[in-house]
């Protein structure tokens, strides 16, 4: 869920001021919900807005001060980046997983490596898979592939 994006402290302050509709120096769940709809086009329920506020509300007053708001924005940016990275990994996994089995087999790995100009034999491919095959089934699941790509 996108909350907003602010690269600098000045942008964060300006964004906070935009979301602080009543100008009291705090953002309520209702203000957050309204601004997410009007400025970002993102519909959130009262409950979701309340959960977003609660997720960073350090003092427990049910409102966001500027520092708490900045933490919310930063968390949203990290989440968005993780989603983008996950989508890219899913696409890469799909390139290697060519047999429709939902996993990368030694054969599918070999085929893709050949397309990329690397001539590995099937035993080399088995060894590559074995290194990250956490459950020992001889193939790489998407989760194992993610671990391999982040290693």
UniProtKB/Swiss-Prot annotation:
Its job: Potential calcium sensor.
Species: Oryza sativa subsp. japonica (Rice)
Amino acids binding Ca(2+) 3: 133, 135, 137, 144
Binding-site residues for Ca(2+) 2, renumbered to this chain: 57, 59, 61, 68
InterPro entries xref list: EF-hand-dom_pair (IPR011992), EF_Hand_1_Ca_BS (IPR018247), EF_hand_dom (IPR002048), EF_hand_pair_protein_CML-like (IPR039647)
PANTHER family: EF-HAND CALCIUM-BINDING DOMAIN CONTAINING PROTEIN (PTHR10891)
Binding-site residues, Ca(2+) 1: 20, 22, 24, 26, 31
GO molecular function, one term: calcium ion binding
Keyword Calcium: yes
Gene: CML31
Keywords associated with the record: Calcium, Metal-binding, Repeat
Coiled-coil blocks: none
Name of the protein this chain belongs to: Probable calcium-binding protein CML31
A Pfam family hit: EF-hand_7
Residue ranges of every copy of the EF-hand domain listed in the record: 14-42, 44-79, 84-119, 120-151
